[in-house]
């Protein structure tokens, strides 16, 4: 069973996918969000879900640092509900606090240029979100 991880932003959606065993997360191409037709975002994800036989989607849940739910987290909740309805897939909201900052730090430490970092950060954040979820799942199973 494969799982997809998403870092949903206002302009892009970072995407990662697990291996068949649910051990590791790998980045996939970032989806550019459509301002004109939000359904295109869900159509792209539906195709990805179908092509990869995905059973579950882990969506980054950007809580505030004090643990409260703000505007961004509410948007993630709405996105998750819509994805469940349109793609008939189970979704999980996963605390994503500091994943983007961690992704930025890794890219800076790897001496990736600012231009390339901008393109890679959403994908890497999605990998961090999904890998965190997978690690927790394997830890609770042992």
From Swiss-Prot:
Look up the record and report any one GO term of the cellular component aspect.
cytosol
Q: Name one Pfam family in it.
A: RuvX
Question: Mind listing the UniProt keywords for this protein, alphabetically?
Answer: Cytoplasm, Hydrolase, Nuclease, Ribosome biogenesis
Q: Which SMART domains match?
A: YqgFc (SM00732)
The record ties this protein, via PANTHER family, to: POLYNUCLEOTIDYL TRANSFERASE, RIBONUCLEASE H-LIKE SUPERFAMILY PROTEIN (PTHR33317:SF4)
Q: One GO biological process from the UniProt record?
A: rRNA 5'-end processing
Q: Which organism is it from?
A: Shouchella clausii (strain KSM-K16) (Alkalihalobacillus clausii)
Query: Which NCBIfam families does the entry link to?
Result: RNAse_H_YqgF
Lineage top rank: taxon: Bacteria
State the protein's name: Putative pre-16S rRNA nuclease
Q: State which Enzyme Commission number(s) the record gives.
A: 3.1.-.-
| Main localisation | cytoplasm
Can you say where in the cell this protein is located? Answer: Cytoplasm
This molecule's function is given as: Could be a nuclease involved in processing of the 5'-end of pre-16S rRNA.
The UniProt similarity line reads: Belongs to the YqgF nuclease family.
InterPro entries linked to this entry: RNaseH-like_sf (IPR012337), YqgF (IPR005227), YqgF/RNaseH-like_dom (IPR006641), YqgF/RNaseH-like_dom_sf (IPR037027)
- Using the UniProt record, name the top-level EC class of this enzyme in a single word: hydrolase
A GO term, aspect molecular function: nuclease activity
